[in-house]
Curated annotation (Swiss-Prot):
Catalytic activity: L-glutamate + ATP = L-glutamyl 5-phosphate + ADP
GO cellular component entries: cytosol
Binding-site residues, substrate: S54, D144, N156
Stored SMART domains: PUA
General function of this protein: Catalyzes the transfer of a phosphate group to glutamate to form L-glutamate 5-phosphate.
Binding positions for ATP per the UniProt entry: K15, T176, D177
Swiss-Prot/TrEMBL keywords: Amino-acid biosynthesis, ATP-binding, Cytoplasm, Kinase, Nucleotide-binding, Proline biosynthesis, Transferase
Gene it is expressed from: proB
Domain PUA: 282-360
Pathway annotation: Amino-acid biosynthesis; L-proline biosynthesis; L-glutamate 5-semialdehyde from L-glutamate: step 1/2
Compartment annotation: Cytoplasm
Protein name per UniProt: Glutamate 5-kinase
Amino acid sequence: MSRSALRRVKRLVVKVGTGTLTDRAGRFDRDNCARLASELAEVSRGRKVVLVSSGAVALGAERLGLARSRGKPWDLPTKQACAAAGQPHLMAAWGEALGRHGLVTAQVLLTADDLASRKRFLNARRTFERLLDAGAVPVVNENDTVAVDELKVGDNDTLAALVAGCVEADAVAMLTDVDGLYDRNPAEPGARLLRDVPRVTAEIERSAGGAGSERSVGGMITKVKAARRLGAQGVVTALLSGRRARALPALLAGEPVGTVFAPGAHRLSSRQGWLAAAARGKGVILVDAGARRALVEQGRSLLPSGVRGVQGQFGVGDPVDVAVDPARPFARGLAGYAADEVRRIAGLKTGEIERALGYKYLDEIVHRNDLVVLETGRE
């Protein structure tokens, strides 16, 4: 997608980071919130817009009178308490700011579990659709109060990518406190802003550097990884300053602002997008190099003959990772057989399945229509 094609975007996810909504002292910046609301109202004319907003933890800390000690991160209960105290005020701020422009806001709090479950994912999609059809602006955040560390989405850059898949967005705009992605630390002399990134490479990831600030969870690296994930789904990602006036309208007018990450050539189906972005494999099917080539290069289904083993337990229809090296899954799909059944037919020809099991559901362990190649596992 070229920059000029951004003018044709009809469904947009806008992610606003904590650094954009707070001042240097960590206080909520209502003036910038009001300015962003005006720009969101402008770009929502003729488009459906979903807002993913950070800031609840920072706002809650301000309300509770808690200060973060430099170098000493808060424990999970403290973060959750801040989120609980801050989220109502965050919604009130957006409701008031967008309401001045005649827009109705709707709070949507999600967890990783909500999106990993196909049923709950589809329920969330139907809710989003009804809200967007009614002209509302869904305001999304992770439900930090109930999410546990090991099951958290973790940062709102990743959440924005997951939400984009849920609402089938054309583009994601991430508003941050810098003008875009630079080829090195922007504080260094000679740092160059990268306007257009055709593909997220290992070099691009290295240039993104380390973690977030004291007030935010994610850093540039989480944004770049989200852009890579979105690109694999056929969604364009833009990274631009949430402090620069009219950057968002300029982006959607095709002007040279921020950094634009080009999408892949093919858009995944709805089911494949969910498998790639939101689903979590309940086990791993280990395959040989020949099976990997058949799946990745030829778009084939996974047959028993290429299977070497199974890790974990899963049932028919469960998401399952496919890997040569179990630490680096290269694909994910929906299992046509349960884990114990796959163990019994591993390495066999399709004509031998019924003899081994006494029955046969399918020729394929994972059908190609229920399988997606994961870019993160490509060699």
